């Protein structure tokens, strides 16, 4: 969540990795719902003058999450046709570099959609079941401007090539993935 003052200066209000889904601002505070990397949707409050002051108001998922393995997304960046592409990996519990693991590639719909570090229940389930779960924002995804998103005339081409390059990159980074 960013704030823009009257001079055009932009500053972070909340700088934590994840996704802020809804918010309201009043009386120098923001109230918002967010998914962080390892915490499902909850309600938070933060003072606008202190980006590090976010306080969790609800604990709706604490009982559900208690005692469960929650993987922290590991960020990766690779190059594809002149673009820096962001992707993430969730590793299984007690990941052992000497063992082999099955893997699952998750591809978002759209193509005009986007992944982030935000908590993802389906990828957490896969990691908890012993899979290396990996996903990226290929060309055609949102959040990087029109030129990145525009794959008109190459739908199923550029995005496919990008996802396959990401898969090759992850297989290089994680030789523990069983082929």
Where are each of the predicted segments found?
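Structural recognition of the beta-propeller blade-terminating site
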Residues: 4-5, 47
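Anion-binding and metal-coordination hotspots
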Residues: 17
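Terminal RNA-binding accessory module
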Residues: 1
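Serine-hydrolase catalytic core recognition
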Residues: 21-179
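A short beta-strand motif characteristic of beta-propeller blades
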Residues: 9-14
């Amino acid at each position: 969540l960013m704030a823009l003052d009257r001079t055009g200066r932009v500053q972070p209000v909340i700088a934590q990795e994840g996704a802020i889904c809804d918010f309201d601002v009043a009386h120098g505070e923001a109230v918002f719902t967010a998914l962080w990397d390892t915490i499902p949707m909850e309600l938070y409050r933060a003072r606008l003058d202190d980006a590090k002051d976010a306080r969790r108001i609800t604990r709706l998922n604490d009982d559900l999450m208690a005692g469960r393995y929650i993987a922290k997304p590991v960020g990766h960046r690779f190059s594809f046709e002149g673009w820096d592409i962001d992707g993430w990996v969730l590793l299984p519990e007690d990941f052992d570099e000497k063992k082999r693991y099955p893997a699952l590639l998750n591809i978002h719909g759209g193509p005009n959609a986007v992944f982030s570090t935000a908590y993802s229940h389906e990828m957490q389930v896969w990691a908890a079941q012993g899979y290396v779960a990996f996903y990226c924002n290929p060309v055609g995804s949102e959040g990087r401007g029109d030129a990145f998103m525009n794959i008109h005339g190459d739908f199923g081409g550029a995005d496919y090539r990008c996802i396959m390059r990401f898969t090759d990159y992850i297989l290089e980074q994680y030789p523990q993935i069983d082929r």
